[in-house]
Amino acid sequence: TAKWTISPMRLIIGRRKKMRTKFLDKPYLVWSVLFIVAPLIMVVYYAFTDKTGAFTISNMAQIPNYLSTILLSVLYGIAATAICLLLGYPFAYFLSKHTVRTQQTIVLLVMLPMWMNFLIRTYSLMTILGGSGVINTLLNKMHLGSLNLINNGGAVILGMVYNFLPYMILPIYSVLSKLDNSLVEAAQDLGSNRTTVFRRVIIPMSLPGILSGVTMVFVPCVSTFYITQKLGGGQIVLIGDVIESQFQSANNYNLGAALSFVLMILIFICLGVMNHFDSGTEDGGVII
């Protein structure tokens, strides 16, 4: 039998690569501990303690008083996510059919608003929808009368869609742009029409992008508070508004942390459900 030996030089190179990898991992681990793990621990700590630092469940006992607000937040998040999916998927699909240069240009335009400050984007929407905004100014000049486009639920959902739509488009586009066209051609050769190919080949294979987009849109929509304050006029109160008021106005960190803890658990459950649906997909999805 032949004996295989590894030269000392290869061992040294292999060890150096491992040491280099460990060294490069250190900053990420430090960053994760400082800005992810530590804040989560602080949230849990404040959620189960009172102002003196003693253990208590009184904060969690107040959660049922906010169940309707949590439910409303989930409903608004679902509505905004559904609209983003209905708008984002066709956009990403047709974008993936263009030339590479056109795709790069359009992707840049999609990402451009994301480089702007979130507050500026929301304020710009207020100037469009406000009573003296662009739309109502044009309507008044045409003697059609002004419309109440702000300080309502529709404006809040529109603000969510406007701010988070790129997070739906980009993951779906990323998957669709790498789609194996040979599978589509094979389905067409077997007699499938365009609708069947789209429903049973393209959509299943783009499922990872859909799930990523849904997650990236739903999570910030549920927890947002600035959009509701500016576009809802204080008439729409979501769980993010309650948490923000507990930390900023009421100075009740413990109740705010308890609500944040419940919201965090809700988000983890949603992510678990998404991962469950995504568990059967690999390399762009499966054909059903």
Q: Where are these predicted regions, by residue range?
A:
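Membrane-interfacial helix termini and adjacent extracytoplasmic/periplasmic loops
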Residues: 122-161, 195, 231-235
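Non-cytoplasmic
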Residues: 39, 43, 168, 209-244
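Transmembrane alpha-helices
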Residues: 27-36, 82, 112, 162, ...
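Membrane-embedded alpha-helices of multi-pass transport/permease systems
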Residues: 37-45, 86-91, 119-123, 136, ...
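C-terminal transmembrane helix and the adjacent membrane-cytosol boundary/short C-terminal tail
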Residues: 1-7, 11-14, 22-28, 35-38, ...
